[in-house]
A protein has these predicted regions:
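Structured soluble/peripheral alpha/beta segments that form catalytic or ligand/cofactor-binding pockets
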Residues: 1-178
Length: 178
């Protein structure tokens, strides 16, 4: 699953796309460690910490596109683990594709978490500083082929209620499976 590492980022302002990247990396640009848990992909870092029954994920972005756009910044997700229900172990899916019969899987790591961050988008006529604080979610995709080879299209979304979040994800694969 680590043969096709990539990072995708989309930034919208009032329903208009301001920035989109889908950066693929050579497998040797992906490194990880268990204690403390972190993954590095190129100049981007993903860290996980558990502090006082709170699960924190922090993403540190440092991206440069061929178009000269640059995105830098930090995003932190914080989840109160006392409100989390148990789910199946996602790592059990990461077997040989022949055994699991899938080429792509979606891992909804934090379906509902507090999020805060600061991003700097440079490359247009202006530099955008984007600060945010609110409610969001965080997911990962994993597969045994480049993600773009797995699907024709996909649809996803979320609805936050007072105590719950509804998240859906539908992928129309190239072999006709939904």
């Amino acid at each position: 699953a680590s043969s096709f590492p990539a990072i995708s980022v989309s930034i919208y302002n009032t329903q208009k796309a301001e920035y989109y990247s889908f950066l693929e990396y050579a497998p040797d640009r992906l490194t990880s460690q268990n204690e403390p848990f972190s993954i590095s992909l190129g100049s981007n870092i993903f860290e996980r910490r558990v502090l006082d029954e709170k699960l924190e994920y922090e993403i540190i972005l440092n991206q440069m596109l061929d178009s000269s756009y640059q995105l830098t910044g930090r995003i932190k997700f914080v989840l109160d683990t006392t409100k989390v229900q148990e789910s199946a172990d996602f790592s059990s899916l990461l077997k040989e594709p022949v055994q699991t019969k899938f080429s792509h899987a979606w891992n909804l790591i934090q379906p509902r978490a507090g999020v805060m961050g600061n991003l700097v988008l440079d490359g247009r006529s202006d530099i955008y500083n984007i600060a945010f604080n609110g409610l969001d979610y965080h997911d990962h995709n994993v597969g045994f082929e480049p993600l773009k080879d797995s699907f024709v299209d996909w649809y996803w979304g979320r609805v936050h209620f007072t105590d719950y979040t509804l998240v859906y994800y539908v992928m129309n694969t190239k072999d006709g499976v939904k």
